[in-house]
Amino acid sequence: MKTIENYNIKIYTDNIEDNAVEQIKELMSIDVFRKCKIRIMPDVHAGAGCVIGFTGNLGERIIPNIVGVDIGCGIYVRPFVCIKDIDWHALNEFILHNIPSGHGHRNATSAPLPDKYMDGYREAKEIVKALRCNRDLKDNKRLYKLIGTLGGGNHFIEVDRDEVGLYYLVIHTGSRNLGKQVADIYQKLAIKCQLGWAELMEVKEQMIAEYKAAGRKSELREAIRQLHCSFKTKKPAVPQELSYLEGRYRDDYLNDMRLCQRWAEINRQMIAELITDWLVAQGSADISTCEEKPFESVHNYIGLDNIIRKGAIAAYEGQKCIIPLNMRDGSLICIGRGNTDWNCSAPHGAGRIMSRKQAFNSISLDDYAKSMQGIYTESVNEETKDESPMAYKPKDEIIGNIKDTVNIVNVIKPVYNFKAAE
């Protein structure tokens, strides 16, 4: 474990890059965050705008960049009983034709959603319409077609098996382009607020109310024009990437973030239902007799207790959670210990030891393929080398670092893996 002098920070690993430490220090150098209790998870690595593995309560301020662009991303786990050998190639073909991935969306080349999934589709569509930032979204019609689709990069569909022979369908994906757009909209707003835009809006609203009350509505347009002309931006007190929201803009962000979380939840469950329905129709899976219930672990969000988890999951006492390791080694199923010193959190994965660029340049396709022997996958290719097992921290390192926050109750190993390129 590492600490950073003069701050209430604990980093639950010794394996952390210098630039990740600098990202943490940059945030804590901002006066309003200096005294915050920050806990960094063992899968820590540098990220875009904020370190991955960040947890903390930032009070009445929100930095959209910390939550990031894949709001509500998470992993959904659907246990099932396998009653007949699964045709893995047929499953792969089903996914390719029914679950668009990467930059794909539902269009003429993908199979239409069956009627039984229309309730989920309609709810997802209403979520997009209900966003407070809806007017700033681009291409809403395409957003409607993203439900039931898988992201690229580290997102995946897996079928895993445990030591007693129970199977698990594991879905890792998030809010897709919807979450990215919402994150970008609010980060731009946060930057504007640091330049004085929020104060300008307050003056403008007060002016509108006063002019209307005085019966001077016809003069408003010119008065507002002059107000904007006289506005001078102030020098921002924080770096652009750490700009924050307060007050009603914070409330707007929280509202839309939670809607994106719900959208991502629907997305994962729809993918899981599509696949389990296919497995049942093939006579390969029995869902009804499986005593284990589905569950999910979400990262990239702000909890109701105001804890931000960026690349981290909740691990409250008794909470079931999943920590994926890599494409070869599978995942840990755990029960949270509710350790408040960890902000009741756990890592959302093993954590990268290579950047995507490093992985592409240093890992050979042959080594990648050898590492995946024994697992059925048609996804081992040049475009997914950045997700090979060697790009991630060793499983034993993560297992050794999490004993104070979770109890490991099961290890599930992949027998099938599907992954799309970024």
Show the residue positions of the predicted features.
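A generic, well-ordered mixed alpha/beta core segment in the N-terminal half of proteins
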Residues: 66-130
